[in-house]
């Protein structure tokens, strides 16, 4: 089987709230569980030699959610950013951390923490992990300097949560991406799910507008 190159995988981490609702839990419980899955996802990507992993965690449109949920998501992101466990994990795994987003409405405390983690992991080069937080693709394209310009084209976009849209994610980089709409809610995403998604990707015939030669 011919294998497509897999340099950049992007994910829209969707379904946390609905996952929690099915268990009669508050939405923030789903976000807590979903955050735990990210560490495992990083290992899956490393094992498959992915060089860029980009995760959509909070969009500009997400400010329209209930204030308590928005506040919790920002607090959760900050806690993960400043955690020594996070830094140790990134250094051990040789991961370069990047943030993709707009500074609007974000606290100085959070922005300073992001900048520090980026600085401490800047020399790592096995995997570039980009967290898109407070980001919008259209706003990015409309800005004077495209803030996502450091990212290469996406090979595979996976959206969990049984929703079939790209929700204003990195529009420029998604131009020729293969897209998989995964039914699994994000907190239930496992290594088996990842392997199924990657297998499906490698079965695709990527043409980039051309006609593939006959064998």
Locate the predicted segments by residue.
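Flexible, compositionally biased loop and terminal segments
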Residues: 1-215
């Amino acid at each position: 089987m011919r294998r497509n190159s897999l340099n950049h995988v992007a994910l829209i981490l969707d379904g946390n709230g609905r996952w929690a609702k099915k268990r009669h839990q508050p939405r923030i419980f789903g976000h807590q569980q979903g955050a735990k899955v990210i560490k495992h996802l990083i290992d899956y990507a490393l094992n498959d030699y992915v060089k860029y992993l980009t995760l959509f965690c909070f969009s500009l449109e997400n400010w329209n959610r209930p204030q308590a949920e928005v506040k919790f998501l920002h607090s959760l992101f900050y806690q993960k950013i400043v955690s020594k466990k996070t830094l140790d994990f990134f250094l051990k795994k040789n991961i370069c951390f990047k943030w993709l987003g707009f500074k609007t409405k974000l606290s100085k405390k959070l922005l300073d923490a992001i900048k520090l983690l980026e600085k401490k992991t800047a020399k790592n080069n096995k995997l570039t992990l980009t967290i898109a937080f407070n980001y919008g693709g259209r706003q990015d394209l409309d800005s004077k300097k495209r803030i996502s310009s450091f990212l290469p084209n996406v090979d595979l976009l996976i959206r969990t949560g049984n929703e079939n849209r790209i929700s204003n994610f990195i529009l420029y980089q998604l131009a020729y991406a293969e897209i998989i709409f995964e039914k699994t809610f994000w907190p239930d995403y496992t290594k088996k799910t990842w392997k199924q998604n990657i297998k499906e990707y490698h079965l695709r015939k990527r043409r980039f507008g051309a006609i593939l030669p006959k064998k």
